Amino acid sequence: MIAWQAAALILVGVPEVLLAQSAPVPAHPAAQDFSEADRLRGGYGPYRANNDLLYYQLDVRVDTVRQTLSGKNSIRFKMLKPGRRIQLDLVRVFQIDKILLRSATGAPRALHFERAAGRTVYVDFPETLRQGRIYTIDFYYSGRPVEMGRFGGFVFRKDPMGRPLVNTACEEEGASVWWPNKDQWRDEVEGMEISVEAPSDLIEVSGGRFQSKQELPDGYTRWNWKVQYPINNYDVSLNIGKYVHFGDSYGDLSLDYFVFPEDLEKAQRQFAQVKDMLYAFSRFFGEYPFPNDGYKLVEALYSGVENQTAITYGNHFENGYLGRPASGIGARFDFIIVHESAHEWFGNSITARDRSDMWIHEGWANYSESLFVEYMWGKQDAITYINTGKENVKNQFPVISTEGVFSTPPADQYKKGALFLNTLRSVLDDDAEWFSLLHDYYQHFKYQTIMTSDVLAYFNKHTGKELTPLFAQYLRHAAIPVLQLKFNAAEHTVGYRWAAEEAAFDMPVRVGRRDDWQLIHPTAEWKTLESPIPMDEFEVATDLYYIDVSKQS
């Protein structure tokens, strides 16, 4: 935004701390202020780091009448270091019935376990597990889930017609709200199997490829699914309801949709948008990441979550997001279809290694919305669309939060993350190079867990530019940079410099008149530009760069 007044300095939304060039605003409480449960849950301590996840086989039964859950998770892992203990996670509302170590030569052996702070479960072995060896344990549990987090985690509900409905949504609270696992983001299984026993009058849908179902003698049906790609824990899903199914295809990719019967016709119309989305994102990033598992949308009562290959959808089969906006660019497409599907590339295929770097999911997915707009309606509409997000950015805390503890980054990770990427595009000032970078960035990191340092190193290397100060200013500091302008009408000059918390910040920016921009290269030191443009007509391309501007005469 630009604020100006002759003979005065006006700054709108610019903290005094920024102009004083003082230390960054702290993001969240310091690491020592977090609880032991937060440190165990968010850290990658020795009993997580000593093993590498290989495979899960999750087998559960859901009782929709008693609202209970029981079953086991078989966990296969390789020891990276010798040890006698590993760390797993399960919320305390569940009872741990037993944990068994499989043996190739005899009966399974019961293992000792200890529940520590929060949801931590230490599993102890009678002998030292050898480095490089592969082991499998069966973790049996039972209990009644308790709703947690924004969308509930594991939720028993009734659909609008009063029929039983069960959905999962646990990105915020973690998968251990409903099943035992190594609940962190750094280490992912290479694949998994999901088997769910549900009442036979209902349909169960999980991520992965449908394998089979078996009618059981007690009124339950067992649904079997197989995930054939790496998957993070929170993306493992379970949905049980009175669903009807309809299918389609996009080339060789299967498209499967599960909705309430009364919503079938609306869904058939609204979900036609999926093909445009798939084409756009495949064009920008590469093919859909999980072709062998297919693409699914599953109706839910909350707005939607990016469960891998089984995205939950609750946007009322309308464009926009839950009825907003009523007009404008955002009203031209279904936000949930576009945003949550973007997570298949950014969040599910590429996953942040630590929650502190969650902008790698949300900032990139939010930016992908503007790319969809650009594909459908052109670049100018995309720029307009992405700039509508500015009103939602608070700039109170850095986008990247405290690493190594359980801490959710601020909501700015969404819009500010996207605005940063739009700014980066403008800095590079070469759309052909930008789109090539986006495609190659995704291809380079797909099916991996990464940190911001990896993103930065990639862009530094492949642009040949030193982008470290730019990344640091937008992601590791709270405030955005201010372009300070000082006008001398008599001499027809404009002084300019950056006021930014990152000392080496030196981003180029376009100024002057919109139909004839001039590129300047401000630093922290004053420079001078000859310009006959009066102060009240002198523009800055704030739609291309996420900055504040101050004008002074």
Range-by-range predicted roles:
Residues V25-A27, R92-K158, D218-G219, T528-I533:
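A surface-exposed beta-strand-loop module
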Residues S35-A37, D138-Y243, L544-I547:
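Extended, low-hydrophobicity, Ser/Thr/Pro/Gly-biased non-transmembrane segments
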Residues G83-R109, D201, R510-L519:
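Solvent-exposed beta-hairpin/edge-strand motifs
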